[in-house]
Amino acid sequence: MKSNTYIIGIAGASGSGKTTFAQNLAKKFTKEEVLLITQDAYYKDLLQLTISDRAKHNFDHPDSLDFKLLKEHLYELKLGISIQQPIYDFNSHSRLSSTRTIEPKQIIIVEGTLILSQKELLKEFNTTVYIQLDEQTCLDRRIKRDISERGRTKEEVLIQYSTTVKPMFEKFIKPSLLEADAIIPGVENSIDLEKTHLQ
């Protein structure tokens, strides 16, 4: 049975503006029409690790994310079935015991750094977009976000950037732009995806 659900995948480097782009795109539709899903909700639970080991974990590698669950959730949403989405706590690097009920919508926007690097996940998208922005701007944005929202110091952010973020970007994220239907140079130059195009 063919689904009427339209799924858009939006990827790009950390700090590239993909979340802002996804949010702005969602505003083109009513709350009854559109659903926004973030890759970040699908980080694997590290509760079994010590606090120090969690901090050393490579969160920028695809293996740190439960893409199998994300794919299952997208499949269920296309069938009109509500899902129980994990709630991830970035301060403790673990999933909360509670979940978030997500109802199916006609348009689903999925955003995340690595979503275009997963071949099985690509099959779920009707349209794919890659947000491209210079490295320094991405880093500056990440520093500001992680300090204000995730309780980290600038030194911690810079160490993580040099040891995992940048290497994983070069290995997985940057090559995934070849899977994009549209490559957008920064969120300021957002593409105009009209409702008629997404129907």
What do the predicted segments below correspond to?
Residues 2, 103-104, 144, 166-199:
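NTP-dependent small-molecule kinase module
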Residues 96-148:
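ATP-dependent NMP and nucleoside kinases share a basic, alpha-helical "lid"
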